[in-house]
Amino acid sequence: TLLEGLVWSDGAPVTSEDAKFTWEWVSDPAAGTTSGPAFANVADVEIVDERTFKVHLTDTDPAWYNIFGRGTSNGAPILPKHLMQDYMGEKAQSAPYNLNPVGTGPYKVAEFVPGDVVNFEINENYRFADKPFFKKVEYKGGGDAPAAARAVLQSGEVDYAINLQVEKAVLDSLLQSGSGELIVLPDGSVEHVIYNFADPNTEVDGAVSEPSTQHPYLSDKAVRQALALGLDRDTIVEQLYGQTADPTTNVIPVPDMFVSPNTSYSFDPNEAAGLLDEAGWTGSPRSKEGVEAKMLFQTTISPLRLKAQEIIKQTWDELGFDVELKSIDSSVFFSADAGNPDTWKRFSADVEMFAFNGRPFPIDLMSYWKSTPGGRYRSEVQRLVGPQPLPLAER
């Protein structure tokens, strides 16, 4: 049920029609939204009255509240139907709302210069009359993480910066100025490497990395284990991240109730080499039955990620892999453009590295490990997250 009297920042009322419309708009494949998968379990959004709606699910979902969420999930916030209804499907990309959104929060957009700055002013229609506390907020973009850190910790021209992907040596030097404070919170975001189980070099109906294909060497469990043993997590954290990160072998490091005690990989190149030899991958570059272990390893353009790539490449090269590095602008890599070959979802490489956002209740994140036709998975994972009816306690 929506709050009584809730209105958009342009003064229009927020209604159940907006919720139903959001489901229809986001779920349309032609719109190319990144939030579409979050609604895959929604069968219908039923309007009860102007402020009440029911979400009908096709299967039990303990994280149902994440559907209309944002920031802590892959869901989407409720959208204003009166501004978006003329921009369904392929028209979604051209909606004026994309550059001039309205919402129900304490601020509204006063100015947006893409790639540069967003200026916010107080939303006079905000539901709490005595908030917010700042008359305006300037959200500055562009530049890079080190520049953002200097603006807070050195020059003091900026009040606050978030998610600083800054190398340890640079951050330590800036902190010595005493102009700012570093606050580190365990948010559950994990920088991780993903192996492509499909073949990025074989086209199926004009597309690569199709589930119906099999990767020539990453389909071998021994190869994947060797690569994992060749990941020097401690060195990456000590040299690059410092106090802003902890090494982990879990996709979900927090909260404790979701942390697996059974996942562990030490850095052991000797064991990795032994696994490869035993599996028949020999030589330099390593090969087996005419297949060479040549690898394209992609990530975004970020000082930390590029240096982490170099550390990983060094060990993998020493193990006998032929590793080529590729870096992609983050606006391209994380794009929702279905026709873009360089997005993380298209996965036109053998290996890629990026971070999942943390979630307080990460059930929806675990859906990435659910089987799809042609996928590779553990049957137990599919059983627990799939549509089969299971007792709630077992789930």
Positions of the model-derived regions?
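Primarily extracytoplasmic ectodomains and periplasmic/lumenal surface modules that are beta-strand-rich
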Residues: V7-W8, D61-W64, P247
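Contiguous mixed-secondary-structure segments that line small-molecule binding/active-site clefts
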Residues: E90-N98, P253-V254, E271-A272
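Mature extracytoplasmic/periplasmic domains
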Residues: P80-L83, Q243-T263
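A structural "hinge/loop" feature
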Residues: A12, T34, W64-A76, T104, ...
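Extracytoplasmic/periplasmic ligand-capture domains
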Residues: T1-T34, D44-E46, P106-L240, D256-R395
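Surface-exposed binding/hinge segments that line
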Residues: P37-Y87, E111
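Short, P/G- and charge-enriched loop/turn segments at secondary-structure junctions
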Residues: N41-V42, K91-N98, T104-V109
